[in-house]
């Protein structure tokens, strides 16, 4: 579970930068092209308690991602396109003795684009809330315990059955203004924390010529639940989230902030286990996140950064409510990071996560991590 989570979150920004920028061109003729992109990320992490010299755990998070993107020119301004992206966990043995699946299909979608009318595609893609939450994912080697970046959790992170319409510059009428409309079909026959009912989402972005960008995203869905007592399936409403964010990216400075609020979103199982979660109610009625990051480019290859995350859960619907407060800190951390870019393909990095949560009985019962983490690695991306 931990390996898969780390693989899913560790390098999304590097791949976004490599896709189309540093990608290897396999074929390009008559407006038709096929590109190969990916990354290899050997890295290691050490955990230790606050003010303790003893290392509590070691972890190898080495992974790789490989993607193919293609485009076919159908008519004058009509194109079809497709992307498939695969993640590989390189820290596991060749033959697993259990049924864990360390490798996964991250993305897989296809669609059409027609001039200023925009594009439409369907498949496994990024949820609409990722558009704004990605503003603070500037440091790709930081594993943020943010519920708004979890995958297969409605329209946050990557998810299945997404019909996505994108339009840049509002049909060519307003420079810098773009929007995304998204519909997610019902997903079932999977773990309860990964099912969802149908839902809709929208994201609006405005970019200026001076490096300022503002984004607002939201979605609303129904939660799919299986009532094992009578073997009947039912849909319950009121699952959704919204996020507001901005960034400044100019003059060698990158500053971004994100505020997100969700209702009835499902956290990872290491926070609220199946034994604690109520089968009749969502796990957390209200979740609030504040995220911020600042980075500077020294033009010598060094890119130091400082980031902050504060995630709170309110009105928790879990059993034994007398021993668990209704409001709970899910994550609170500061990340001090730096990376050095040897060239456009190779970089090395180091990150120190200061966990601001204090260990107590409630934190321990909910399996919320409180250790500080040191991580370092090398990334080759193309």
Curated annotation (Swiss-Prot):
Residues 1-23 form the signal peptide. It is found in: Cell outer membrane. GO terms for molecular function: porin activity. Keywords: Cell outer membrane, Ion transport, Membrane, Porin, Signal, Transmembrane, Transmembrane beta strand, Transport. Pfam families: Porin_1 (PF00267). The keyword Secreted does not apply. InterPro entries: Gram-neg_bact_OMP, Gram_neg_porin_domain, Porin_dom_sf, Porin_gammaproteobac, Porin_Gram-ve. Its main location: membrane. It is a multi-pass membrane protein. One of its GO terms (cellular component) is pore complex. GO terms for biological process: monoatomic ion transmembrane transport. Belongs to the Gram-negative porin family. Homotrimer. Forms pores that allow passive diffusion of small molecules across the membrane. This is Porin-like protein BU359. It comes from Buchnera aphidicola subsp. Acyrthosiphon pisum (strain APS) (Acyrthosiphon pisum symbiotic bacterium). The lineage of its organism: Bacteria, Pseudomonadati, Pseudomonadota, Gammaproteobacteria, Enterobacterales.
């Amino acid at each position: 579970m931990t390996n898969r989570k780390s693989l899913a979150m560790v390098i999304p920004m590097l791949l976004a930068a490599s896709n189309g920028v540093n990608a290897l061109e396999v074929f390009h003729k008559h407006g038709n092209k096929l590109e190969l992109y990916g990354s290899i990320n050997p890295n290691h992490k050490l955990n230790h308690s606050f003010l303790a010299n003893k290392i509590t755990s070691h972890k190898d998070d080495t992974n790789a991602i490989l993607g193919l993107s293609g485009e076919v020119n159908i008519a004058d301004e009509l194109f079809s396109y497709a992307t498939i992206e695969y993640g590989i966990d390189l820290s596991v043995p060749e033959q697993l003795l259990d049924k864990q699946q360390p490798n996964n299909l991250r993305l897989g979608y296809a669609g059409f684009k027609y001039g200023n009318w925009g594009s439409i595609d369907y498949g496994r893609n990024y949820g609409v809330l990722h558009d704004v939450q990605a503003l603070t994912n500037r440091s790709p080697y930081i594993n943020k315990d943010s519920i708004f970046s979890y995958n297969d959790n409605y329209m946050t992170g990557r998810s299945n059955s997404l019909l996505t319409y994108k339009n840049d510059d509002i049909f060519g009428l307003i420079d810098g203004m773009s929007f995304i409309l998204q519909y997610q079909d019902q997903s079932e026959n999977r773990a309860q924390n990964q099912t969802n009912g149908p839902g809709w989402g929208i994201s609006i972005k405005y970019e200026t010529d001076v490096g300022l960008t503002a984004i607002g995203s939201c979605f609303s869905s129904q939660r799919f639940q299986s009532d094992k007592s009578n073997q009947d399936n039912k849909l319950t409403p009121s699952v959704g989230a919204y996020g507001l964010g901005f960034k400044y990216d100019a003059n060698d400075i990158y500053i971004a902030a994100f505020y997100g609020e969700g209702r009835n979103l499902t956290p990872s199982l290491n926070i609220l286990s199946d034994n604690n979660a109520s089968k009749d109610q969502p796990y957390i009625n209200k979740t609030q996140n504040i995220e911020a990051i600042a980075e500077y480019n020294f033009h010598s290859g060094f890119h130091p950064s400082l980031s902050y995350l504060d995630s709170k859960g309110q009105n928790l619907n879990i059993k034994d409510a007398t021993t668990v407060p209704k409001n709970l800190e899910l994550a609170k951390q500061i990340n001090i990071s730096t990376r050095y870019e040897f060239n456009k393909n190779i970089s090395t990095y180091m990150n120190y996560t200061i966990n601001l949560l204090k260990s107590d009985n409630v934190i321990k019962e909910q399996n919320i991590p409180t250790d500080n983490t040191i991580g370092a690695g090398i990334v080759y991306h193309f």
